[in-house]
């Protein structure tokens, strides 16, 4: 698994074919157009076949609740993987436009297949790139309608070292507004210490943050943290 984690940072996949197998499993077993069934089938694969690194069912309920609090018209996810997080966002905010940024074309292709099967590909879009690519992806998002004060919700679930610089890039564009919510997964494991320290320093000034104690995806032994932060402006 250690080799798989190293693969994640370069290819976006664990490296043993489980992501493609998960997509095939979903298309074979989940009802078309049924978001609940697609999500449950991904969870079933992760529990019974091969562990996946999407946010998962336990932490997914925290994500769902935060999305509902934000009630977004426009949502952004960083780190698509299989499209699971974006699918949960789309389910919790059925009127929202959801954009997901992913570094790996293979993951983008897998996610698009899952979104099409779930019936949400008309409002969930994958943009291949990274926020730290010199502005290309940020400019692409601008072409999709991202503008000053339009971004209601952000889900960070990509390279943990990129959480803080990528959030700063979003802030520099002015897309957030007072009341926008940012959720960050895996803040304890693998860990995003600089991001967590930033949110602690900014508590009550630029951000109001709740730290949710939970577990790493698809097991109950390893503790994790999900941070939910409301932007104060």
Swiss-Prot record:
It is an enzyme of class 2 (transferase). It comes from the Bacteria. GO terms for molecular function: metal ion binding; O-methyltransferase activity. S-adenosyl-L-methionine binds at residues 55, 77, 79-80, 102, 159. A divalent metal cation binds at residues 157, 185-186. The keyword Methyltransferase applies. Pfam families: Methyltransf_3. Keywords: Metal-binding, Methyltransferase, S-adenosyl-L-methionine, Transferase. The keyword Secreted does not apply. PROSITE patterns: SAM_OMT_I. InterPro entries: SAM-dependent_MTases_sf (IPR029063), SAM_O-MeTrfase (IPR002935). GO terms for biological process: methylation. Its EC number is 2.1.1.-. Gene3D superfamilies: Vaccinia Virus protein VP39. Belongs to the class I-like SAM-binding methyltransferase superfamily. Cation-dependent O-methyltransferase family. Specifically methylates an O atom of its substrate. This is Probable O-methyltransferase Rv1703c. It comes from Mycobacterium tuberculosis (strain ATCC 25618 / H37Rv).
């Amino acid at each position: 698994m250690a080799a798989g984690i190293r693969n994640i940072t370069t290819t976006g996949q664990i490296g043993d074919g489980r992501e493609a197998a998960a997509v095939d499993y979903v298309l074979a077993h989940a009802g078309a157009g049924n978001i609940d069934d697609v999500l449950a089938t991904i969870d079933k694969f992760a529990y019974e076949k091969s562990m996946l690194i999407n946010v998962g069912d336990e932490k997914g309920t925290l994500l769902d609740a935060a999305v509902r609090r934000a009630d977004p018209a426009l949502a952004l996810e960083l780190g698509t993987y299989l499209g699971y997080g974006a699918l949960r966002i789309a389910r919790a905010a059925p009127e929202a436009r959801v954009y997901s940024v992913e570094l790996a074309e293979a993951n983008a292709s897998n996610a698009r297949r899952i979104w099409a099967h779930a019936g949400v590909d008309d409002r969930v879009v994958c943009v291949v790139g990274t926020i730290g690519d010199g502005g290309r992806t940020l400019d692409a998002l601008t072409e999709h309608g991202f503008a000053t004060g339009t971004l209601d919700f952000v889900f960070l679930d990509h390279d943990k070292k990129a959480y803080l610089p990528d959030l700063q890039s979003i802030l520099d564009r002015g897309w957030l507004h007072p009341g926008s919510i940012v959720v960050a997964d895996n803040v304890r494991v693998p860990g995003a210490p600089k991001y967590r320290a930033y949110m602690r320093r900014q508590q009550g000034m630029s951000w109001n943050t709740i730290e949710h104690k939970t577990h790493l995806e698809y097991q109950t032994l390893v503790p994790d943290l999900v941070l939910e932060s409301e932007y104060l402006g």
